[in-house]
């Protein structure tokens, strides 16, 4: 799974991507210029808590993305953790991710 790293790539997804919000995850999706392998970023803002909490949230998001067979080719996807992500089960996060991907038109 390739990741989005540069600020320019994040900016492009924010400016021209679709977004969907859930209670456990927020998602931003933008179509890439080429049909290469999709890239994913996992974001846990500092307002969620200390490093232990943020890292757990990112691990749960990463595993949910793996279970849902992300990445989908031709897309850049940014997954944001919310305060409820820390206490949620992997199954709940995975279900929410699937619902949000359908909402933005990927699945």
Question: Which stretches of residues belong to each language-model region?
Answer:
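Positively charged, solvent-exposed patches that mediate nucleic-acid binding
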Residues: 1-107
């Amino acid at each position: 799974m390739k990741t989005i790293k540069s600020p320019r790539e994040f900016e492009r997804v924010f400016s021209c991507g679709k977004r969907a919000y859930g209670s456990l995850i927020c998602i931003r999706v933008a179509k890439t210029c080429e049909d290469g392998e999709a890239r994913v970023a996992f974001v846990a803002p500092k307002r969620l808590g200390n490093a232990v909490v943020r890292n757990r949230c990112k691990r749960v998001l990463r595993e949910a993305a793996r279970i849902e067979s992300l990445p989908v080719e031709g897309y850049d996807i940014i997954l944001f953790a919310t305060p409820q992500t820390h206490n949620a089960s992997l199954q709940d996060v995975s279900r929410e991710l699937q619902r949000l991907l359908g909402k933005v038109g990927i699945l």
